[in-house]
Design a protein with these regions (language model features):
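Compositionally biased, intrinsically disordered low-complexity segments enriched
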Residues: 14, 51, 302, 313, ...
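Compositionally biased regions
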Residues: 2-5, 24, 29, 34-36, ...
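Beta-strand-enriched accessory nucleic-acid recognition/scaffold domains that flank the catalytic cores
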Residues: 21
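Intrinsically disordered, low-complexity regions enriched in polar/acidic and amide residues
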Residues: 11, 537, 572-573, 599
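Well-ordered beta-strand segments characteristic of repetitive beta-sheet solenoids
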Residues: 65, 81, 109-111, 118-124, ...
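Short, T/G/N/S-enriched strand-turn elements that build extracellular solenoid repeat scaffolds
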Residues: 79-81, 107-111, 129-137, 152-159, ...
Length: 615
């Protein structure tokens, strides 16, 4: 009876919607979800900028992008744009199309008038976008732009069927329906965890106030720009904004030891004054060049390499404790000081310009280095500083070498080159304890040249200095040409060796050759001329042919002066001392002096002439 009824019976289902029909309704826009895997359209944006967000039949988030403008830009605005591990599909196909992530995808009804050339995904949020999966363009290839001023984090992100991928914290700039570029004020992009795979994308852009790379980036053509800038859509022009009161990041681009860039070619630009670049990982261009410019300090403790060229430029200091290598040319420019404890090399030419260079004993500066580490027969090394150039490690060149600064300190280094030029300008030149081998060596300084303990071998030696110290050093010319030293100051050759196969001519203020050797070895003559004294105690002045000595005074005690196959001539204004010394010539020997002390000395010749004027 009606009074005994406790309620109405439950309604029975009279029909059901199959999954296939429901997916078709979603694809046609009849039904849509407001979010999928963290992707939410911004309902405060104009309607023509709100994409339709749904899922494919296989459960992959799908975005039916909005109708493109006349400029081919589909402008899509979100309040959240996070991509999960399963990825997301940006539907740029008017008709049904097969995708890698989601299989068959129904056509996008918003594209009745044509597909997009650029898919702009603009995020209005206080939170960074989390990109943890691939972004696939269904249908026609397009440039994918993800712009979130709050920042972007990529952990396993990547792109499929995109001809260009752009991650930016800049505000998109639109003009007459075209995307003209990005205005960057803030925001950081981080690459972490599983990194970023843009290897199937022609061009990859990362544009932000600062960038941290703690994982790998794989790309074909990678460009990273940091700082407060206006950057054009093609990432070809960057306009630096005037400084403001906003707090600066500590580092503009930071590549950790776990991070790396692996691309065909790489261009890195940091424009913010005083904010530098730090690389502890690997930056490698497998097909092209690596270019890094910064308006702040560059620190490299990792590796930077390129198939072609490497170009590093900074307006501040540069510190390299890692490795830099170019398959073609390496160029480094620093408006500050260059501190170098690692290696800088190239297969062809290496060029360095800086205000001051300091290279440790473990450092390497090289040009003409083959892949196996051996020197080729070509490749020039040029290092130029406006201040002191100090290089204490290996300095190697398969071809020519030019080291120029206001003072050169090459002590304890190993130097090898064909035509090697050392120019210390108005400063001093030091090759103390050096090991130097060259075809032609040109050493020039307006100051003092010190080769104490150093060994220099060259086919041709050309030395210009105020004075020379070769204490326990060796200056050896191995070619057949003449060796000339013309110095306004003195020569200190104590326990040292000055030698040449050809003639040796020494013109100086004085010569201290105690326990030293000055030799014209094979077929040359020796000529020594000083306005001061020559001290040859326990030393030797020898030539295979003639010997000519003209000095204020001569001390040859326990020393040797020998013209093995020629004549000898010794002329002094003051005394000649030959105590227990030896003077000899195969031909005639002439001695003209103020006085002569030959106590227990030996004078041997084929005709002796002695003139004493009593001075």
């Amino acid at each position: 009876s009606p009074s005994s009824r406790t309620g109405y019976p439950r309604r029975q289902r009279i029909c059901r919607v199959t999954p296939l029909a429901f997916s078709l309704w979603l694809a046609s826009g009849m039904v849509h979800s407001v979010s999928a895997a963290g992707i939410v359209a911004d309902h405060g944006a104009p309607g023509h900028q709100q994409p339709t967000i749904m899922q494919t039949a296989s459960g992959i988030p799908q975005v039916n992008i909005q109708t493109p403008s006349a400029g081919g830009v589909s402008h899509n605005t979100y309040s959240q744009f996070d991509v999960g591990n399963q990825g997301v599909i940006l539907n740029n196909a008017h008709n049904n199309v097969q995708t890698q992530l989601g299989g068959m995808v129904a056509g996008n009804p918003w594209l009745a008038k044509g597909e997009a050339r650029i898919i702009l995904n603009e995020v209005n949020s206080r939170n960074p976008s989390q990109l943890n999966g691939f972004v696939e363009v269904a249908g026609k290839k397009a440039q994918v732009v993800i712009a979130n001023p709050a920042g972007i984090s990529c952990d396993g992100c990547g792109f499929i069927n995109a001809n260009r991928a752009t991650l930016t914290t800049g505000q998109p700039q639109m003009k007459n329906g075209s995307l003209t570029g990005f205005s960057v004020e803030r925001g950081e992009i981080q690459i972490t965890g599983k990194g970023m795979d843009a290897s199937r994308t022609d061009y990859t852009d990362i544009i932000a106030r600062s960038v941290k790379i703690n994982a790998g980036i794989w790309a074909q053509d990678l460009k990273v720009t940091t700082g407060r800038n206006n950057v054009d859509i093609a990432h070809g022009q960057t306009e630096k904004k005037a400084a403001d009161a906003s707090s600066q990041p500590q580092v503009a681009l930071d590549v950790s030891s776990l991070g790396g860039m692996y691309a065909g070619k790489i261009r890195l630009v940091g424009t913010e004054t005083g904010v530098g670049v730090r690389n502890a990982g690997h930056i490698g261009a497998q097909a092209g060049a690596v270019t890094l410019t910064a308006d702040g300090r560059i620190e490299n403790s990792g590796s930077i390499s390129a198939k072609t060229d490497v170009h590093l430029a900074t307006t501040r200091d540069l510190h390299n404790s890692g490795s830099v290598y170019a398959g073609q040319d390496t160029q480094i420019q620093s408006d500050g000081a260059f501190t170098h404890t690692g290696s800088v090399a190239s297969r062809r030419n290496t060029r360095i310009q800086t205000t001051r260079l300091t290279g440790s004993e473990r450092s390497l500066l090289a040009a003409g280095v083959k892949d196996d580490g051996r020197l080729a027969e070509a490749g020039n090394l040029t290092v130029s500083t406006t201040g002191v150039l100090a290089a204490h490690g290996q300095v190697l060149s398969g071809g020519n070498m030019q080291l120029k600064g206001q003072g050169l300190d090459l002590s304890n280094s190993r130097i090898q080159g064909q035509h090697t030029g050392l120019d210390a300008g108005s400063g001093n030149l030091s090759t103390q304890n050096v090991q130097l081998s060259a075809g032609t060596l040109s050493a020039r300084t307006a100051g003092h040249f010190s080769n104490n303990g150093g060994t220099i071998n060259a086919d041709t030696l050309q030395i210009s200095a105020q004075s020379l110290s070769n204490h326990r050093g060796k200056l050896i010319q191995t070619g057949t040409g003449d060796f000339s030293l013309n110095l306004p100051g003195g020569v200190d050759n104590r326990e040292g060796l000055l030698a040449a196969n050809g003639a040796v001519r020494l013109d100086a203020l004085s010569l201290d050759n105690r326990r030293g050797k000055v030799q014209a070895v094979q077929s040359g003559s020796l000529q020594v001329k000083t306005t001061g004294a020559v001290d040859n105690q326990q030393g030797s002045l020898t030539a295979s042919r003639d010997v000519r000595l003209n000095a204020q005074a001569l001390n040859n005690d326990n020393g040797l002066i020998s013209a093995a196959a020629g004549t000898g001539r010794i002329k002094t204004q003051q005394a000649v001392s030959n105590t227990e010394g030896r003077m000899e010539s195969a031909g005639r020997l002439g001695i003209s002096a103020g006085s002569l002390n030959n106590h227990q000395g030996t004078v041997v010749s084929d005709g002796l002439s002695v003139t004493l004027d009593g001075a």
